[in-house]
Amino acid sequence: TYDAELDQLYIGTGNGSPWNRKIRSPEGGDNLFLSSIVALDPDDGTYLWHYQDSPGETWDFNSNMDIVLADLEIDGEVRNVILHAPKNGFFYVLDRTNGEFISAEAFAEVTWASHVDPETGRPVEVPGARYEDGEAFVESFSLLENIVRERFRTPAETEHYSVVEVIRYRDG
């Protein structure tokens, strides 16, 4: 998505391969830039900032869904924001000037993480969520089904107005 107001280009990225992080990155880590929004200078490609919504992604939760630009009043101040609902089941609001995490709320039943920590902007994974750590996480299939049903039945262009209303009501 190109932001003419800020002259920034936002790119949603995919997941890594192989999906199993223990094979892809045996030493662990976030696998930076997987399942992220990366902001670049469109003139020369200079990296500006990124936000990773699924650190160490291992469930095919890519982040290349619609990136909606909006100006929202948050805590009495109008902020330039990104509205984004990737495959991990959370709806994100980010400051598009610098990638600062503002909020995230589940838009479908999420079984791999309990919530997104408001201080760090990182999902709080539930025990056993990573299939490479033990038995298969059967609920992840339920999660994917819920996300596909809730997220992909209509394009964001027709949904974002109701989502903005939800944000407005939550923020007062």
PLM regions with names:
Residues 1-172:
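Beta-sheet-rich non-transmembrane sensory/scaffold domains
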